[in-house]
Amino acid sequence: HYTRSNLEKKILKINPDIILFYGWSWKIKEKIFKNYKCFMLHPSLLPKYRGGSPIQNQIIRGEKMSAVTIFKINEIMDGGDIYFQKKISLMGSLSEIFKRIIVAGTKGTLKILNTKKIKIKKQNHNRATFFTRRKPEQSEITIKEIKEKPAEYIANKIRMLENPYPNAFIKLNKGKLIIKKFKIK
């Protein structure tokens, strides 16, 4: 298992030709991406939604479509050249979205590994948007949100916080009500 602290040591020991960072949440040290061919999978239509919690940040903002992007890591957070990008739907449950990400990510990885000449696309950094990783306390559905936000917003907040993420909840006098499923009628 690789962690932020043991990554460099393990990479130096293995000395790989290519490194794929899929599901990785930390910045890669320059020593690594300068000396190895490093790719990252990011579930957004880069350069939009760079940074943490891209799936949640897109869903809560009402996005219906996204993409799976595989890019070469450089010194800019989620800012490297794009080697693969495929649009995916953000509709349905989180597990359905994950399946789409896996299928598109697998196809993209195989294309990168098996194609001699790939059309590389530079990112337009002027069009980039950046978001921070969501915190567990942001999973709360507040009374203010219930009163002021449309039902679709609340539904999206619940949907984007399905397992494995900290589920949506409402604070009660003695504890909290965790919400895992919803139905709009």
Predicted stretch roles:
Residues H1-K185:
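One-carbon transfer enzymes
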